[in-house]
A protein has these predicted regions:
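Binuclear metal-ion centers of metallo-dependent hydrolases, dominated by the metallo-beta-lactamase
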Residues: 12, 16, 90-106, 151, ...
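Active-site metal-binding motif and surrounding structural segment of the metallo-beta-lactamase
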Residues: 38-82, 154-161
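Short, Asp-centered acidic motifs that coordinate Mg2+ and/or phosphate
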Residues: 31-32, 49, 159, 186
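Active-site environment of divalent metal-dependent phosphoester hydrolases
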Residues: 40-42, 56-60, 83-86, 102-105, ...
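Short hydrophobic/aromatic-enriched beta-strand-loop microsegments
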Residues: 75-78, 93-100, 159-164, 188
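Core dinuclear metal-dependent hydrolase active-site scaffold
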Residues: 1-45, 97-155, 217-229
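Redox-cofactor binding/interface segments in oxidoreductases and associated redox assembly factors
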Residues: 34-35, 51-52, 114, 162, ...
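Metallo-beta-lactamase
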Residues: 128-185, 189-196
C-alpha cells in the first residue's frame, strides 16, 4: 500500500485502505496515515505521522499504531482519549495530543484539529495542508454540524472526505450535508462498505452541488488531487 511516487507540484496522492476512515496521504515531502485499522504494520514501510481522530475500534488499533511507530519512528498526533491510551507504548517525544483548534507541523505540512460531531469521548477532525497549500479535510466519521460552513469558507478545501455509513446516524444524505457546508473542489464518500451508498452520495452531489466533483474511491488505489486554482 506504500505510495512510491512523489506527487507533482501543487498535488498530493492518497489511498483509502479500509471500509472506515483509513487514508494514506502523501505530499511532496511527508507521508501521513490517518486512522489505520484492519491492515498489517508492513503495509506502511514509510510514515512521518499517524493521525488518530478518536478511540473507537474502527479508528484506533493501539498495537498496530505501536508497531508502525517502532518501525518508522513517526510522530503520533491524537485526540486526548486516544493519546492517553497510547502514552505507555509511544515515546513521549513522539506523541502529540490535540484538541479542536490546536495546530501542529509535520515538516512543512500543517495539521489542524477541528470539531467532530460523533459520540466518542474527545473526537477531532483534521485539516491537512500540504507544503504547496493543497487542503484536505479528513472528517473522521463526523455527522454535519453548523460550524462546517465557516470552516469551509475559511479554508477553501481541495478535498473533503465525507462519511456515508457505518457510524451512528451516517447516511449518504448526511455525507452530502458535509459537502454542502464545506463546498470542496472534490468530495470523497468513505466510511462505508456499500458502493450503493457511495453512488447515492454521488448522485446527490451531481444534482445539488454541481460545482463540486465526486470521487468514488476504490480501496487501495492511488489517487492524485490538485490545488484549487
Amino acid at each position: 500500500m506504500a505510495i512510491e511516487q512523489i506527487p507533482e507540484h501543487n498535488t498530493v496522492l492518497f489511498v483509502w485502505f479500509n471500509h472506515y476512515a483509513g487514508v494514506l496521504i502523501k505530499t511532496p515531502s511527508e507521508t501521513i496515515i490517518v486512522d489505520p485499522v484492519d491492515v498489517k504494520p508492513r503495509s506502511f514501510p514509510d510514515a512521518d505521522a499517524i493521525l488518530i481522530t478518536h478511540e473507537h475500534y474502527d479508528h484506533l488499533d493501539q498495537r498496530l499504531i505501536t508497531n508502525i511507530q517502532k518501525a518508522t519512528d513517526c510522530v503520533i498526533v491524537a485526540d486526548p482519549t486516544s493519546a492517553r491510551g497510547l502514552q505507555h507504548s509511544i515515546p513521549v517525544e513522539k506523541l502529540k495530543q490535540v484538541r479542536s483548534g490546536d495546530e501542529t507541523k509535520i515538516g512543512e505540512v500543517s495539521i489542524k484539529a477541528e470539531k467532530c460531531n460523533h459520540p466518542a469521548s474527545s473526537p477531532v477532525t483534521y485539516i491537512i495542508t500540504s507544503e504547496d497549500g493543497v487542503k484536505i479535510f479528513h472528517t473522521a466519521d463526523s455527522l454535519p454540524f453548523p460550524e462546517l460552513a465557516a470552516i469551509g469558507e475559511r479554508e477553501k478545501f481541495d478535498v473533503v472526505f465525507c462519511t456515508v455509513g457505518i457510524a451512528p446516524g451516517a447516511t449518504p444524505q448526511t455525507g452530502f450535508e458535509i459537502a454542502r457546508l464545506t463546498k470542496p473542489q472534490i468530495a470523497v464518500p468513505y466510511h462505508t462498505n456499500s458502493n450503493t451508498y457511495q453512488r447515492e452520495f454521488a448522485n446527490i452531489i451531481k444534482k445539488e452541488l454541481p460545482r463540486t466533483s465526486c470521487l468514488i474511491p476504490e480501496q487501495n488505489k492511488i489517487y492524485q488531487i490538485g490545488k484549487r486554482m
